[in-house]
Amino acid sequence: MPLKIDRLNLMLGLAIVLSVFSSSSVMAAKVSFKEFCPQFVGQWAGDAAKAGEIPRKVAVTGFCSHDQRQLILSVSIGTRAPFSETWWFREQGDQVLLTYYDGVAEDKQQVFSLYRQNGDYSLLGEGVVNARPALIQLLFDAQAQNQAGGWQWTQNIQYLDDDIDRYQLFRGIEMTPVAPSH
């Protein structure tokens, strides 16, 4: 009889654990670029900094093409480059091609997959950062506490040649609307 009770307790415990995991973790789902693009139209302001640096004030301007297949985010003021940064995202099939230009270095390109989870958008890709292979995440975290509908844009990396198995913050940009969007 004790064996049956132990087995029943084990099964009950597994059922509880599985129900907790299935209800609390919502899987990220791939989304279309047409859903993502119009969310970032308008003018934004906030602080930006790389990890360990002092934040600087920035302005971000977002343009989405009429067909919603291209998004340009221009980040200016307070960037390390003497010119603004241009982040040109464009839909390419079920992926997103990013071209980054800062007015100083050569253009950089990266291919990403676009996901949505709990109102946040995440672009995930594999590339090279600081001459090291890395997973790259551009996370646009919806700021629910901000009634104006802002975003926290973080640029995260996870080096593939490292034992650390989590993303590390590379840079963050706060985006609070300063002008009506759309």
Residue positions per predicted region:
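Sec/Tat signal peptide C-region and signal peptidase I cleavage site
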Residues: 24-28
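Edge beta-strand at a domain terminus
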Residues: 29, 113, 139-182
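N-terminal glycine/threonine-rich, aromatic-flanked beta-hairpin/loop signature
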Residues: 56-95
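Short beta-strand segments that buttress and anchor functional surface loops
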Residues: 46-49, 71-78, 98-102, 122-129, ...
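Bacterial N-terminal signal peptides that target proteins for export
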Residues: 2-13
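Short, surface-exposed coil-to-beta transition loops
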Residues: 54-59, 81-86, 106-111, 132-139, ...
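N-terminal helix-cap/turn-to-beta initiation motif at the start of protein domains
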Residues: 29-45, 145-146
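Bacterial N-terminal signal peptides
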Residues: 11-22
